[in-house]
Amino acid sequence: MTRKLTRRHVLAAAAATTTASFVTVARGAPAEAQKITPELIEAAKKEGKASWYTSVDLPVAEKVAKAFEAAYPGISMKVERSGAERIFQRIGQEYQSKIYVCDVVNSSDAAHLIIWKRANMLASFLPEDVAQHFPKEHWDPDGMYASWRLTLSPIAYNTSLVKAEDAPKGFNDLLDPKWVGKIVKAHPGYSGTIMTATQQLARDLGWGYFEKLAKQKIMQVQSAADPPKKLALGERAVMADGGEYVITELKARGEPVEEVYAVEGTPLITGPSAVMARAANPNAARLFYAWSMTAAAQQMNVDVGGMRSAHPMVKERPDRKKLSEVKTLREDAAAVADQADDIKAHYTKLFKV
């Protein structure tokens, strides 16, 4: 049986296996912005492939990969999609076994990038678009990672089952007895989005909120992409959390779903990406990573994937509230990095799953 790795295990394993071959930057020296050059493109095409581990919903990930392949013929992208917490486990296990499959990684749990950076598992590469346009809170000064996507974890409801005037307006409304047996919810042990959201809600509302929610006979699912889909199918009337981008795309297709931005504030989740220090295809990895941060690629994330972007040149979708109009909860990736194992344990104790 494969041993389940905690974040502390990853750091310990990295400390035991780190060598001088890791790509690192001296702390305190800002990384230099890197352009997409003809030389990088040529080197990437010689490698001909790259492996991308991501927690974004598979249909979205495949669209992104195909767009990159169309932009750079001759380079194929292999998409490995799973929940962020599962990706974290997989990379940790591969790392322990000295198997380096992942070239580029994306996680909906920003704390993972902090931990991988601490463990010297990331390569320094700062795309020009990130350095020139992204707010500084959305990229690491050492060039180890940057926010590839932003999303929210709102409440939502099925409009065929719930009238707008009866829908919950905030998280505390979900504790009303009328919602017993009617709520679907994702799991922080699988989803990075939900891990981040759980940390924010536990901090701001207290664990007492989750203790009461656990008594509502919720449908427990894994991925943050699952609650919106269960909602659209009518399997539950309300979702307590989940990926906003999935709700956005379902709604655009005419499914009976509607998001609710909670009066208490809606969890904001950044999804950083990075190039792995041990990437088997380092040039293709850097090219894909740099391309994914361009205004055009970021706009595609929004238009086709329903995500949000930190790139100021990207236009918001007209079919939902602008991010600036949504009251959001404060994200604290460093706190998640330190608290995640305890959060999982506490959540499992409350929800018995």
What are these regions (language model features)?
Residues L150-L152, W179-G189, E211-A214, Q220-V221, R253-A277, S292-E316:
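Periplasmic-binding protein-like
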Residues A156-L161, T198-Q199, I269-N281, M300-N301:
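A bilobed periplasmic-binding-protein/Venus flytrap-type ligand-binding module shared by bacterial periplasmic
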Residues M1-T17:
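N-terminal secretory signal peptides and thylakoid transit peptides that target proteins
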Residues E316-V353:
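Extracellular/periplasmic bilobal clamshell ligand-binding domains
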Residues K35-G74, I155:
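Short, polar/charged alpha-helical segment
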Residues A111-I115, A237-P256:
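A ligand-binding cleft/hinge motif common to bilobed small-molecule-binding domains
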Residues Y53-A65, M77-Y95, Y100-P228, A232-E235:
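Extracytoplasmic ligand-binding site segments that recognize negatively charged/polar headgroups
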